[in-house]
Amino acid sequence: MLLYSDLTYAINGAAFHVYNKLGHGFLEAVYQEALEIEFQRRNIPYEREKELKITYDGVELKQTYKADFVCYGKIIVELKAVSALEDAHRSQVYNYLHATGYKLGLLLNFGSSDELEKERIVL
């Protein structure tokens, strides 16, 4: 069974709704604001631009990472508005998971003209 499958299903449903309403072509900030509204409407618990501590070899760093969203207190949701996801985007989420101790990240790209691109990244 997939990690947090029911929770990611709810998050993806909200993201699909936003993509179907807005389509592609907006800045990432537009999708972030719309997705926040959709999370509220669907009672999906979230924190927007949550500052996360990063640890290196057991030591907490001064630098932090701001996740676009953390949903349900355990899923990092990273938004993009680019023509296609690239390995650098996947690596970014993987590194965030590794550095913060979270186990699951969702990478959502609203910039594709074909459909909402979504990827699960599991640590």
Regions found by a protein language model. Name each.
Residues 1-45, 121-123:
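Solvent-exposed, charged helical/coil patches
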Residues 80-123:
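Nucleic-acid nuclease catalytic cores
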